Amino acid sequence: MSRKEQKKAAQTKASRMKMARFGGLALIILIVIIGLIAWSNSGESAVSETAVLAPPHLDGPADAPVKIIEYADLTCSSCRQWHNMGIKEQLQADFGDQISFEYRHFPVITAASPRWAEAAQCAAEQDLFWPFHDYVYENFEPYPTVNDARLQEIAAAIGLESEPFESCLAAGRYDKFIGDAIQRAQSDGARGTPTFLINGQQVFPSYEAMSAAINLLLGS
């Protein structure tokens, strides 16, 4: 074999070794990536399996043609005022089963807001979300603080079983749910409370504006 041929053979061998090393490195990287993805997915599955799945707080038929969503905070002064004006009840009287109301938490007004939202969720486990919601708005001052005495007062007033209610709160069962609720509200365009959506569109929370939007959707 000539020197030229030997040089070419050596270059070819070196090139093959380089490709083999590169291929081996690429395979290792691929295995690491697959492992990371599998680990990530297993972590996500663990979270989703342990996360609390809470049913919606719905007042009205789930299949109503007009769906009204309220993003609100139990410490919110404007939410309390809207509730006590009776607009919801007036709309329900006017439109009946053609509308449904859904309450969604957006607890961002005070430091106590997330705790109130968690307490409402714990009350919902006993099918007492709406009585809890109504009691807070109708009996406490705006921006109420949350403490054991107030929670015991509500429990006695609306018929909550104290032990499971207190256990639910102590366990922090709805911590993640409340955090997710805030993100959901923001993704739906909520920037303050209350924020109302009628079939996905924000509407001013007056009786006139809301009834006009409903009539438009119903074609009446």
Predicted regions and their residues:
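A short beta-strand-turn-helix
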Residues: T50-V66
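C-terminal cap of thioredoxin/glutaredoxin-like
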Residues: M1-G35, Y71, N84-Q90, E153-S220
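Hydrophobic single-pass membrane-insertion segments
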Residues: L36-A46
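Glycine-rich, flexible loop/turn motifs
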Residues: A54-P55, E102, F165
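Structural alpha/beta surface segment adjacent to cysteine/selenocysteine redox centers
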Residues: A64, I69-A156, R191, N215
